[in-house]
Amino acid sequence: MMTPKPLSAELTTPRGAALRGRRGCRPAFGAWGEDLAAQYVESLGWTIIARNWTCDVGEIDLIARDDQTVVFIEVKARSGTGFGDPLESITTAKVRKLHELALAWLVNQDDGVHSVRIDAIGVMVRPGAEPTVTHVRGIR
Protein backbone atom coordinates (compact mmCIF):
# COMPACT_ATOMS: atom_id res chain seq x y z
CA MET A 1 0.00 0.00 0.00
CA MET A 2 1.23 3.44 -0.84
CA THR A 3 1.47 6.24 1.72
CA PRO A 4 -1.33 8.77 1.28
CA LYS A 5 -0.22 11.67 -0.87
CA PRO A 6 -1.47 15.28 -0.54
CA LEU A 7 -3.05 16.72 -3.66
CA SER A 8 -2.79 20.08 -5.36
CA ALA A 9 -4.81 23.02 -4.11
CA GLU A 10 -6.54 23.52 -7.46
CA LEU A 11 -8.71 20.45 -6.86
CA THR A 12 -9.00 20.68 -3.09
CA THR A 13 -10.71 24.09 -2.87
CA PRO A 14 -13.32 25.57 -2.99
CA ARG A 15 -15.39 22.98 -4.84
CA GLY A 16 -14.28 20.26 -2.42
CA ALA A 17 -15.13 22.35 0.62
CA ALA A 18 -18.60 22.97 -0.78
CA LEU A 19 -19.20 19.23 -1.23
CA ARG A 20 -18.03 17.97 2.15
CA GLY A 21 -20.74 16.66 4.36
CA ARG A 22 -23.67 17.33 2.03
CA ARG A 23 -25.70 14.17 1.41
CA GLY A 24 -27.43 15.62 -1.65
CA CYS A 25 -24.07 16.01 -3.35
CA ARG A 26 -23.02 12.35 -3.25
CA PRO A 27 -22.67 11.97 -7.06
CA ALA A 28 -20.77 15.28 -7.27
CA PHE A 29 -18.53 14.21 -4.37
CA GLY A 30 -17.79 10.91 -6.14
CA ALA A 31 -16.94 12.74 -9.37
CA TRP A 32 -14.70 15.08 -7.41
CA GLY A 33 -12.93 12.07 -5.87
CA GLU A 34 -12.43 10.66 -9.36
CA ASP A 35 -10.98 14.01 -10.48
CA LEU A 36 -8.46 13.84 -7.62
CA ALA A 37 -7.63 10.21 -8.44
CA ALA A 38 -7.12 11.10 -12.12
CA GLN A 39 -4.81 13.95 -11.13
CA TYR A 40 -2.84 11.54 -8.95
CA VAL A 41 -2.60 8.93 -11.75
CA GLU A 42 -1.34 11.56 -14.19
CA SER A 43 1.24 12.70 -11.60
CA LEU A 44 2.67 9.16 -11.82
CA GLY A 45 3.26 9.74 -15.53
CA TRP A 46 0.44 7.42 -16.57
CA THR A 47 -1.96 8.25 -19.39
CA ILE A 48 -5.70 8.24 -18.76
CA ILE A 49 -7.35 6.16 -21.51
CA ALA A 50 -10.95 6.43 -20.29
CA ARG A 51 -13.05 7.78 -17.45
CA ASN A 52 -16.33 6.20 -16.39
CA TRP A 53 -16.19 3.56 -19.13
CA THR A 54 -19.49 1.68 -19.20
CA CYS A 55 -20.90 -1.46 -20.77
CA ASP A 56 -23.73 -3.88 -19.98
CA VAL A 57 -21.70 -5.32 -17.09
CA GLY A 58 -21.17 -1.97 -15.30
CA GLU A 59 -18.66 0.86 -15.06
CA ILE A 60 -14.91 1.29 -14.59
CA ASP A 61 -13.97 4.59 -12.95
CA LEU A 62 -10.58 5.05 -14.64
CA ILE A 63 -8.60 3.16 -17.24
CA ALA A 64 -4.97 4.21 -17.55
CA ARG A 65 -1.78 3.12 -19.27
CA ASP A 66 1.34 2.61 -17.17
CA ASP A 67 3.98 2.00 -19.83
CA GLN A 68 2.97 -1.37 -21.38
CA THR A 69 0.33 -2.14 -18.72
CA VAL A 70 -3.34 -1.18 -18.91
CA VAL A 71 -4.58 -0.40 -15.40
CA PHE A 72 -8.27 -0.58 -14.46
CA ILE A 73 -8.88 1.62 -11.42
CA GLU A 74 -11.71 1.60 -8.88
CA VAL A 75 -11.98 4.91 -7.02
CA LYS A 76 -13.63 5.31 -3.62
CA ALA A 77 -13.97 8.69 -1.90
CA ARG A 78 -15.03 9.36 1.67
CA SER A 79 -15.49 12.50 3.70
CA GLY A 80 -14.75 10.80 7.02
CA THR A 81 -14.11 7.46 8.67
CA GLY A 82 -17.64 6.87 9.97
CA PHE A 83 -18.06 4.09 7.41
CA GLY A 84 -14.40 3.03 7.47
CA ASP A 85 -11.52 3.66 5.12
CA PRO A 86 -12.60 4.22 1.50
CA LEU A 87 -10.85 1.09 0.28
CA GLU A 88 -12.59 -1.12 2.86
CA SER A 89 -15.76 -0.83 0.78
CA ILE A 90 -14.25 -2.79 -2.12
CA THR A 91 -15.65 -6.28 -1.61
CA THR A 92 -14.68 -9.60 -3.16
CA ALA A 93 -17.81 -9.34 -5.32
CA LYS A 94 -16.70 -5.88 -6.52
CA VAL A 95 -13.25 -7.22 -7.43
CA ARG A 96 -14.90 -10.03 -9.44
CA LYS A 97 -17.03 -7.41 -11.20
CA LEU A 98 -13.91 -5.36 -12.00
CA HIS A 99 -12.34 -8.45 -13.60
CA GLU A 100 -15.48 -8.92 -15.73
CA LEU A 101 -15.41 -5.27 -16.74
CA ALA A 102 -11.71 -5.42 -17.62
CA LEU A 103 -12.34 -8.44 -19.82
CA ALA A 104 -15.28 -6.67 -21.51
CA TRP A 105 -13.03 -3.68 -22.27
CA LEU A 106 -10.16 -5.86 -23.50
CA VAL A 107 -12.38 -7.80 -25.93
CA ASN A 108 -12.90 -4.60 -27.91
CA GLN A 109 -9.21 -3.61 -28.06
CA ASP A 110 -6.82 -4.33 -30.88
CA ASP A 111 -3.82 -2.24 -29.91
CA GLY A 112 -1.64 -5.00 -28.48
CA VAL A 113 -2.21 -4.78 -24.73
CA HIS A 114 0.77 -6.53 -23.10
CA SER A 115 -0.42 -6.78 -19.51
CA VAL A 116 -3.28 -5.65 -17.30
CA ARG A 117 -3.73 -4.85 -13.63
CA ILE A 118 -6.59 -3.79 -11.38
CA ASP A 119 -5.81 -1.07 -8.83
CA ALA A 120 -7.83 0.74 -6.19
CA ILE A 121 -7.51 4.37 -5.17
CA GLY A 122 -9.06 5.75 -2.00
CA VAL A 123 -9.56 9.48 -1.55
CA MET A 124 -10.09 10.66 2.03
CA VAL A 125 -11.28 14.14 2.91
CA ARG A 126 -11.19 15.07 6.59
CA PRO A 127 -12.54 18.39 7.88
CA GLY A 128 -9.80 21.00 8.00
CA ALA A 129 -7.26 18.82 6.20
CA GLU A 130 -6.10 18.37 2.64
CA PRO A 131 -7.49 15.31 0.84
CA THR A 132 -5.18 12.30 0.70
CA VAL A 133 -4.87 9.48 -1.79
CA THR A 134 -4.11 5.85 -0.97
CA HIS A 135 -3.19 3.65 -3.92
CA VAL A 136 -3.21 -0.15 -3.84
CA ARG A 137 -1.79 -1.86 -6.91
CA GLY A 138 -2.91 -5.26 -8.09
CA ILE A 139 -6.02 -5.89 -6.00
CA ARG A 140 -7.40 -9.44 -6.16
From Swiss-Prot:
InterPro entries named among the record's database cross-references: Restrct_endonuc-II-like (IPR011335), tRNA_endonuc-like_dom_sf (IPR011856), UPF0102_YraN-like (IPR003509)
Pfam families, per the entry: UPF0102 (PF02021)
GO molecular-function terms, A-Z: nucleic acid binding
Signal peptide: none
SUPFAM superfamilies, per the entry: Restriction endonuclease-like
Domain of life of the native organism: Bacteria
Similarity remark: Belongs to the UPF0102 family.
NCBIfam families named among the record's database cross-references: PRK12497.1-3, PRK12497.3-3, YraN family protein
UniProt-recorded name of the protein: UPF0102 protein PPA1431
